[in-house]
Amino acid sequence: MAGTPYVRYVIAGVALLLSVKCEGLALAGDAFTGYQVDNKGEYFAYLGIRAPLMEERKGFQPFIQVFGAGVGYTFKDNGQERDANLQYVTPSLGLKYTAGSWSFLGMVGPQFRWKQEDQATGPRSNENFVGTYVQLEAFRWHEEGIFHAIASYADIDGFSYGRVRKTWLVHKSEQSCCSWYVGGDLAGMGNNQFYAVQAGPLVQVPINIFYLTLKGGYQYSQTFHSGAYGGVELYFPF
């Protein structure tokens, strides 16, 4: 039942963005999705859609973004492991500034969150939260590779997330498929109750308008210490 409003908000957000596209303005948007899991079965799955609200003027362009995600994780309470799940949806308004090959983005919006948590005794708890979400990004695209930095903060639980990604072109194909990029991620996340750090290589393959990314690496978390993670991402403009 807790997932029902989550799905409803995602559908509403997608419909809103599609209505923006259909009303107007032949403006390019972006869609991105992915799934990541670690060796303990903790996962993160997400879907995001971003669309501009008007044409770029003097490098500035406002946009709207809807981002939804589901997270499954394990925590320890008095030495006992317990499982929890949360889902959230964040509709945001943002501003993008482009200068040459660099783009800088900032966005803010409400975050709607639903959490289900195992209890020591009795049924799972179900809680709903509403808070504020802020995100900043810096992105540089070049044929030889990309640089992408992202930082976000949610005030519901004081959770911060940051990631830096760099890729390099290692094989260029003159056909529609397939050039190859290799690179790496360095990410950190946490609040006053939890923290984790991840680092690892990635491979990115453009296929027509799609960008497929495979990634994996080492993870250190407060809960389980050393571990490993792997994931897949898909990005495409529309």
State where each predicted segment sits.
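Bacterial N-terminal signal peptides that target proteins for export
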Residues: 2-11
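Bacterial N-terminal signal peptides
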Residues: 11-21
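Short glycine/proline- and aromatic-enriched beta-strand/turn motifs that initiate or cap beta-hairpins
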Residues: 22-77, 237
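Short loop/turn motifs that connect adjacent beta-strands in outer-membrane beta-barrel proteins
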Residues: 24-28, 53-63, 98-104, 141-146, ...
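Outer-membrane pore/translocation modules
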Residues: 37-40, 63-163, 184-195, 216-218, ...
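Outer-membrane beta-barrel "beta-signal"
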Residues: 42, 47, 205, 225-238
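Short, well-ordered amphipathic alpha-helices
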Residues: 46-52, 91, 163-169
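Hydrophobic secondary-structure block in the mid-to-C-terminal portion of proteins
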Residues: 167-207
